[in-house]
Amino acid sequence: MMTSCNDCKKLNENVIQDEEKVYDPEKMLVRLSVIEVYPEYLDEYLAAAATVGGESVKKEPGVICIYPSHLKSDKNQIRILEIYRDQEAYQSHIASEHFQTYKQGTLHMVKNLELVDMTPLDPSAMPYIFKK
């Protein structure tokens, strides 16, 4: 586990390392899930999203971040920032029991879902933000 930001070292422009992990920004999967939830299921959905996010980060070494939030102006509009070490970590995540429980349990709650793949502007800053 990384103990401080001082443990992070930028090895070169493409690889970031802390004492135990190496992340290749070219392989990382960064995604924004854009979700609209039916109002009558909002509380139930928010609880499920918070649970699966926390479990995933704790249990899966390749899950760097799952950070659900909602728009201030419309709580039914959910955004989830997802960051995975690589495609393999993402595939492992979506096959996990806790993700499948979340997915199957919330399908009827979701009015609309869009998955937007992103490219980080400064991947070298990630070790300073996410200390996993």
Regions inferred by a protein language model and the residue ranges of each:
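Short amphipathic alpha-helical/adjacent loop interface patches that line ligand
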Residues: 49, 53
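Short, surface-exposed ligand-recognition loops at beta-strand->loop->(often short) alpha-helix junctions
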Residues: 36-45
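Short alpha-helical
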Residues: 40, 73-75, 85, 97, ...
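Short, well-ordered alpha-helical segments
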Residues: 46-47, 100
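Short, well-ordered beta-strand segments in beta-rich or mixed alpha/beta enzyme
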Residues: 28-36, 65-94, 132
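C-terminal motif of bacterial Sec signal peptides marking the signal peptidase cleavage site
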Residues: 2-4
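An amphipathic, aromatic/His-enriched active-site/gating alpha helix that lines ligand/cofactor pockets
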Residues: 7-12, 55-64, 83-118
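Glycine-rich beta-strand-turn "strand-cap" elements at beta-sheet edges
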Residues: 6-30, 69-74, 103-132
